[in-house]
């Protein structure tokens, strides 16, 4: 690990503005440090007090943390609650007529629902699910466009104790099939099509394809929401959403579940083949969502209009669209489209139109919008903004400064948030009224999060020295296991080399002299493309499944917009392709990967070689491939290479 060096030096510091501090939920550094001291002095008491303060319990818990079967930690497990009740019912008396969701459709049209209306719709859909035999513990796949209905489907599952597994609408039929099969889903909720940038994307067709790919006899019904009115094939198991719900009652008693009951499974890319079904709990997850909204987003339910641009298919869309904001009774924007349709000012127009106060998006989106110039956002009134956030990958200091100056007018704090699908909620991020920010750093851990940078054995490393990012104590919102694979869970996140109880994030990081964390990248072979985690093994497997391909290796290289670009090295079964033939085959392989996994995984460039650089023991020299992809001079020892002559071939990229 000593080989990890930190080359990023950033010295600018932005203390919170006094006007922000005076109104902040956590006001000033002393208040932040007091929370941290409280957590260190009485760890269980700290979390128990917060859980009692912020969550409505049907049966109060008496046990806070059970570590007897570490690392399978249990939090508040004798308490009973319902997440949907906490997001909807508890607001009805005081906020029933308040707008809950503002749906900004792809074409710019707007629909809104109040808390009362959202509650009624969730109850109707929950009753519909019950009428189809769905109950506590059953798995429901949600393969939906960004919509009010996607949130309704998730909340309805939570209401009856069913376990949802949302699959991003951009994933292919094959990816969907793998998730249906692994979760043994009883029901699928989908739509005819999604609308994105003026184009219709068929979802029902992909669901039909997925269901025809293998043994999916576990699926009893497919509920279809009519989004576009596009043509769909129909079978006996299919049912329209509107027909299912129109006769259902608008009340549905919540099913009270243990705090440890699984709320959802969300699949994330692994560094080896099969996607990992990250399983989250009910009570601990909800607490993480609530606290991070209050602490990191400084949430003010009465005044804020909150907008997180993430799709519900990702963890960000779970915690910071479907659950966190609603648990606090906030008004939020849900966005169907893309930042540049029907025009390049769409994001800024949306902020101005709905008077958005808190805006949370990915560095990828920011970088792509920077390219369009600062004059564009200047055409819109962004004065309603008071807080900006970034998620999905580290933000480079230049993009941070543009975001701060051009979008935030130099007055909005930026919360650069580090967390993962597996952590459920923010882990390291500035509390905006307390912690001074530095462009490019996610700053300091949230109170109660015992984050550290260590060597491969869990030992300390010097300040400024790169190491493994770990969390030393269990925390309420962390994943409980990998669905159906407890051994992989232990091996991946709680390795024996670190004592079996320390959470290994899989990221490398260093801390500066102020203790601030700087994320340096993945320590495994997972790429971060536009804030989406993609396993290199999955892309390699997709390439090799093409009849032309004998062998493939995939690496990432820095990309100024997407964070990382996908670079594929391919050995064909026939002769090495060159010229126009290489371009044609590269195009075919890109489309192939898009069909197998999804468009997000398509290689940005493909390089053809007679073979791949391997050591004499047959191991692919990935470090060498990364250096070639980045255009770096090869300084490492290539004496163990079986065929050094191929290096020149691999330098020729087909874009």
UniProtKB/Swiss-Prot annotation:
Residues the record lists as binding CoA: 196-199, 316, 530
EC number(s) stated in the UniProt entry for this protein: 6.2.1.1
PTM notes: Acetylated. Deacetylation by the SIR2-homolog deacetylase activates the enzyme.
GO biological process: acetyl-CoA biosynthetic process from acetate
GO CC annotations, alphabetized: cytosol
SUPFAM superfamilies noted in UniProt: Acetyl-CoA synthetase-like
Family the UniProt entry places it in: Belongs to the ATP-dependent AMP-binding enzyme family.
Listed name of the protein: Acetyl-coenzyme A synthetase
Organism for this UniProt entry: Thiobacillus denitrificans (strain ATCC 25259 / T1)
Gene assigned in the entry: acsA
